[in-house]
Amino acid sequence: MKITRRDVSKGLAAAASTALMSPSLASSLKPSNLNKPSRHNKNAKRKNVLIIVTDQERARLTLPENLTLPARRRFDDNAVVFEQYHIASLSCAPSRSVIYTGQHVQKTRLFNNPGYGDGAVDLHPSKTPTLGQLFKDIGYKTAYKGKWHLSSVNALKRKDNSQSLQPFGFDEWQKGKDTGGLVYQGANEDSDILADAQDYMNRQLQHDGTDPWLLAINFHNPHDVMWLDANGRQAATRLRPGLVSDMAPAIDQYPYNHDFGFGLPTSFGDDLSTKPEAQQLFLDQAQYFYGQLDPSDEQAHRRVLNYYAACLLDSDKT
């Protein structure tokens, strides 16, 4: 039996909802049990756990009505949806550290992305256990596929990174380097992440299946929208061009060159004069980091919003 892309898409919602809601698994992961020796019944069939993470995706309250996302709809229809959920941190690595440890950034110490800014640190595997370590402790095989961005793995300069995340509790990762979400990486590399995940699941099917597995799949998109040069001038007007990543116009292929009719938000014309000062400061800093973008340029802002919709659609098909 081979797992295809269609099989993965069909099974996402069911696999995620049944695995994550298993009472026996939830009981095993209680804080009081984490430091105890594993006493699971090896003869009992335990659920495999599939975690799927997308990068820089926001709540879907403001998407255009004609944008259909069938894979995400299957999740909504077959799982628990947290409509009032708020993330613990906006930045990539701090937010990801919360997801994979269950601890706030005050505990993970990741206040910035590893390698960027004074005082930026890596996630410490012995101080803040990850889901990989917790599931290993109760007898699971573990694998992580895709964007990591929680430690400076690339600094190790290894030709094969397949075992580079073992200190964090994941038996297997990927041969190539970590990807920090650079320009076009979602469009160009998410399909490779999926293929790597399919290969892992196919290999598990070839074994006797007595040991359950935890597989975390971490896609880039809709992160590609971060590096869109929406007016053709942003890349050249950045304070430090090329910092972290280059910026580039939309890819000239569907869905990235398509207009989804994504309208401007009702707050578009707000001059921020009645808002907290931090909002204006954030806008000012964005002009330096992402280059000059006129806040009143409706066409450029529509390009950003429609490119985000395109990233979502491409991600949904992946």
Which residues fall in each region the model found?
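Formylglycine-dependent sulfatase
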Residues: 3, 7-16, 23, 29-318
